[in-house]
Amino acid sequence: MFKHSLVVLRVALCGALALSGLTAKGAGLTPLEQRWIAGMTPVLQHARTSGMPVDIVVQPQDAPDAAPLALGFKDGRCKFVLSLRGNPEGEATTQRLPAGLEDSALELMAAHELGHCRRYLEGAWFHLPAGFSATPVPEGLSPDLQRAYLSMKSVRREEGYGDLVALGWTAQRHPDQYAALHAWLMQERSRDLLPGSHHDTLTWIKLVRDPKALGSAPSMFDAALPVWQSGLNIDEE
């Protein structure tokens, strides 16, 4: 979700520990893995109650360069992939969780990934709304750089949608904590920011500084969609 955390597509799960249930105790997990899974559990329970096919996958090998949390999609199921072992960013992210709101922040992170899951399941990943016109690729780029540019923009749009879903969850489940968690997400997205890069989602986050901007739709996905579409137009200006 956060820095250096591109979404994992059709992740290779050989040797990984897959958890079909929501309990992490007694599964050979580290305390940090148990902590993250416990924090994400309300979102995972909501997903399963809603009929979304989700699993937790824990990578048992050291993964120093991986995103601590990412989403995989395999055999029609969404995989919440934890890569915390031998990964300094896992501990660093944990240390950056807002004091007193750690569980709610982990829920926000999980809801972000659930937004990706929803887009995969709908077959909408990297797809743009009808009528939306993206700006052309800058001139003078090689074919490889053109593909990289288009991929970067597509990832950023999906990350923006994921952030809006995450904030929609927060607005519905923890309204009294919304301002603090919104500020924390702004801070995370501003760390080492490269404007226009994969995780530059500030265009969308700024649109929902006031949670009322997310409307009153009962679904966090439906709440995110119109704001996401508005942000697409701003992002192209």
Question: Each PLM stretch: what is its role?
Answer:
Residues 29-33, 93-105, 147-156:
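Second-shell loop/turn segments in exported
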Residues 32-55:
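Zn2+-dependent metallopeptidase catalytic core
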Residues 120-159:
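Post-HEXXH active-site segment of zinc metalloproteases
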Residues 148-155, 164-237:
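Long, well-structured alpha-helical subdomains associated
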